[in-house]
């Protein structure tokens, strides 16, 4: 339920800068600046044309399996996670799904010795307005979830701090 856009366009970067306070340094210094988009509510409903396309054309499921999966997904969306209780709930869930590849991208970058940072520090409404007006994506099918910057930072910056393992980890036997 995601799409990734490598944003190289300097004009667009300058337009979003005033509204992307968490990306100020990254917009200048990062060698790669990626927008992570989440699929829209209309595409992520259990009965959407998009999910039908994924199951039929991409996953090549037979029709009877598609119907079974659609019903399981309906139950998940309606009952398990109650994603239809508000307009925002389904989009929030879809945006959470984008954090799975985001985490993998951050980890892969670290393994390769590339610095990276995830970015949520931006005015979503204003940044989306700019990206949509510039034709970066179609708001009928996508919404901006977060951003990520890749590159090499100045090594003289303050080191990261972390809480003790015992404060964040619990074992239940």
Language-model segments: residues:
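Acidic, surface-exposed loops and disordered segments
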Residues: 1-173
């Amino acid at each position: 339920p995601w799409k990734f856009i490598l944003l190289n366009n300097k004009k667009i970067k300058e337009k979003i800068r005033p509204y992307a306070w968490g990306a100020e340094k990254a917009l200048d210094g990062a060698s790669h600046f990626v927008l992570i988009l989440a699929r829209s509510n209309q595409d992520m409903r259990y009965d959407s044309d998009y999910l039908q396309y994924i199951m039929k054309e991409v996953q090549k499921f037979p029709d009877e399996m598609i119907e079974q999966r659609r019903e399981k997904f309906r139950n998940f969306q309606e009952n398990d996670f109650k994603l239809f209780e508000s307009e925002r709930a389904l989009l929030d869930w879809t945006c959470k799904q984008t954090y799975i590849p985001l985490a993998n991208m951050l980890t892969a970058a670290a393994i390769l010795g590339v610095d990276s940072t995830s970015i949520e520090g931006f005015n979503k409404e204003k940044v989306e307005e700019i990206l949509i007006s510039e034709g970066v994506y179609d708001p009928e099918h996508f919404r901006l979830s977060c951003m990520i910057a890749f590159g090499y930072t100045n090594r003289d910056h303050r080191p990261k701090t972390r809480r003790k393992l015992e404060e964040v980890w619990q074992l239940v036997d």
